[in-house]
């Protein structure tokens, strides 16, 4: 059973996912590059990520880091919550640190699994990981203040998902 999850992305959906998964009892690491370090500083200073609107409460992820090695190490699942134009960047950043058995879930997918697979092949990555995409986003949301996300509809942690190759879907769901 998955317990340790890394959420990549320090935008509104990444904040929402990190807070939601922390609320659900998972050990969450929140990661993005140094361009977003001030957001992690805000989360630390304010005692967590505050959810408003359709979700409520303040939740502190176990780890906030801009170090990809720290973010990926021992994560059982890696949720990628970034815009599609960052998929290649993220794939390249995490590739050297991947470990056998990890599940990479791209939300929303936008065919990102193909980008990740291409990058991993190009870089000669041999770790046995699954690549899965979730249809749609976790929830409509917006950063409304430092370390605060307003959620417009209930969080949809389920929805449709598929892996690449499709035969891996059963390993993930």
Regions found by a protein language model. Give the residues of each.
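Short beta-strand/turn micro-motifs composed of small residues
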Residues: 9, 32, 82, 108, ...
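Rossmann-like NAD(P)(H) cofactor-binding subdomain of soluble oxidoreductases
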Residues: 84-147
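Nucleotide donor/acceptor-binding cores
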Residues: 2-3, 129, 157-159
């Amino acid at each position: 059973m998955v317990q340790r999850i890394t959420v990549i992305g320090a935008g509104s959906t990444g904040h929402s996912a990190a807070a939601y998964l922390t609320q659900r009892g998972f050990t969450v690491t929140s990661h993005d590059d140094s361009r977003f370090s001030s957001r992690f500083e805000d989360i630390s200073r304010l005692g967590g990520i505050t959810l408003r609107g359709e979700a409520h409460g303040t939740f502190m992820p176990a780890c906030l880091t801009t170090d990809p090695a720290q973010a990926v190490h021992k994560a059982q699942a890696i949720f990628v919550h970034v815009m599609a134009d960052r998929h290649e960047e993220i794939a390249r950043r995490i590739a050297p640190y991947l470990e056998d058995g990890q599940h990479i879930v791209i939300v929303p997918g936008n065919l990102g699994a193909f980008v990740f697979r291409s990058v991993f092949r190009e870089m000669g990555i041999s770790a046995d990981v699954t690549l899965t995409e979730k249809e749609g986003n976790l929830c409509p949301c917006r950063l409304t203040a430092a370390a605060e996300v307003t959620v417009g509809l209930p969080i949809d942690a389920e929805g449709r998902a598929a892996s690449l190759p499709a035969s891996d879907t059963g390993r993930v769901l």
